[in-house]
Amino acid sequence: MSKQCEHGAGILTRRIVPADNSCLFTSVDFVLNDGARVDTDAMQSLRCIIADAVAEDPVTYNEAFLGQPNDDYCIWIKDESSWGGAIELSILSRHYRVEIDVIDTQSGRIDRFGQSENYNTRVLLIYDGVHYDPLVMESADGATVSTVFPTSDDAVLSQAIEIGAEAKSCRQFTDVSNFTLRCLICQTMLRGQKEAMEHGTRTGHANFGEV
């Protein structure tokens, strides 16, 4: 687990969600619902929100932007085996009118979705190259957790970056350009996310496991 960071209101820490193809959606649902539960069933409603937004704006979400035709993407994202990423986070940020900040433990950077919209609140996720988890603020006695923070609270953001830096120094990340995957449908061995995406486009296979 990543380093915990103390804050005036408690301790910022990482909560682990299931390592499945929907960890992004589970993590977003978790932080938007005040850390009340890890609800792995919530991912389908979030996937539908994204599909609807994409279908309603085919000019922005064209084939060049999505990497596949708009209609195909809308079918693809509703499949529970499909991973989410930057496109999906940007749509969810806009839909819920909240800044979604993602700490990347491989690069050490922070990606701030919705930053230019000047939303009043933010939520925090951490990403290791493959898996997303939520960051939460636990009270000192562990009785309460907070997952939504004012965007004016730079201290929370700084501590989230510290957690990411600690994870990076401990090499708690997956190098997606070089890790080995197996297609769980045809058993083909693939190196890196690029080969996996090319294989999926060519074959329609979308179920991969890390070796």
Regions of interest found by a model, annotated:
Residues 175-179, 192-211:
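C-terminal recognition-helix end and immediately following basic linker
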Residues 13, 179-181:
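Short structural boundary motif marking the start of a folded domain
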Residues 86-178, 187-195:
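Deubiquitinase catalytic domains
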Residues 2-10, 15-114:
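Papain-like cysteine protease catalytic cores
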Residues 76, 118-119, 209:
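Alpha-helix boundary/capping detector
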Residues 1, 134-137, 208:
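Generic detector of short, aliphatic-rich beta-strand segments that form the cores of beta-sheets
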